[in-house]
């Protein structure tokens, strides 16, 4: 495998799991490129742009959280998050078979307790399989309106969506206020994560699934008991 050296800051993020993060970086730089999951030009910035950017979500989750990473692709952000926060439970949801095969190979090789589920987050069968989650993460999967609809569908009441976004995050929120509200998303805001080791920090859109006390319950259902 191609060796991709981590930056000095990576040790503070991954601790004694840094060797596992290094091995994952090597997977991305070799099999990930060969299978079209990572562009060949991305290998020189795998750590900052992909792994550390994803691990930055660890600042915004709580111990014991059940986390679904939707449209996981090459395992971003789910695998770095699981490595940085071994006290959470991560499920990777990915519709494409070849990507699921890659994810399963990586998870098995790293020996981490991460579940891989093939399917789409909006599929009722997938929702039944994974159950209601505390947190739903995503990265480069779709527009904010779609992400909110998919995420709210598998979140428990009060659960949170954490969507890694770019410079237009605030504008996306404003453009999609009505759709977000219809999806049952409340308390929508932008977070900056990883400021101690990323320049610029990761931009994350956070939203909560409404509860009967602060808005609508599950989208499409009455919140009355």
From Swiss-Prot:
Key words of the record: Cytoplasm, Methyltransferase, rRNA processing, S-adenosyl-L-methionine, Transferase
SUPFAM superfamilies, per the entry: S-adenosyl-L-methionine-dependent methyltransferases
Residues covered by region (Disordered): 204-225
The EC number(s) this enzyme carries: 2.1.1.-
GO molecular function: rRNA (guanine-N7-)-methyltransferase activity
Residues that, per the record, bind S-adenosyl-L-methionine: 71, 76, 121-122, 139
Entry's Gene Ontology cellular component terms: cytosol
Keyword rRNA processing: yes
Entries under Pfam families matching the protein: GidB (PF02527)
Domain of life of the organism encoding this protein: Bacteria
Compartment(s) where it occurs, according to its Swiss-Prot or TrEMBL record: Cytoplasm
CDD domains registered for this protein in UniProt: AdoMet_MTases
Family under the similarity heading: Belongs to the methyltransferase superfamily. RNA methyltransferase RsmG family.
HAMAP family named in the record: 16SrRNA_methyltr_G (MF_00074)
Role according to the record: Specifically methylates the N7 position of guanine in position 518 of 16S rRNA.
Name by which UniProt lists this protein: Ribosomal RNA small subunit methyltransferase G
Source organism: Mycobacterium sp. (strain KMS)
